[in-house]
Amino acid sequence: MKTNDIRELTTAEIETKVKALKEELFNLRFQLATGQLENPTRIREVRKAIARMKTVVREREIGINR
């Protein structure tokens, strides 16, 4: 999800998506540990998506408009 798309969401929607992505990341790490992970780059993608969403939320908290 692109940053501009994230900025169009409400803060509550972003928090919901972050929670879902954290669950997915947990499952991906579990698969990695058990040797069942087919796409290891997905871990990186999910981590970066979480970071983007948290950045947008933080921008809103401190009043940065982009």
UniProtKB/Swiss-Prot annotation:
Signal peptide range in chain numbering: none
GO terms of molecular function: structural constituent of ribosome
This protein's UniProt keywords: Ribonucleoprotein, Ribosomal protein
CDD domains per the UniProt record, alphabetical: Ribosomal_L29_HIP
InterPro entries: Ribosomal_protein_uL29, Ribosomal_uL29, Ribosomal_uL29_CS, Ribosomal_uL29_sf
NCBIfam families linked: L29 (TIGR00012)
Protein family (similarity comment): Belongs to the universal ribosomal protein uL29 family.
Name this protein carries in UniProt: Large ribosomal subunit protein uL29
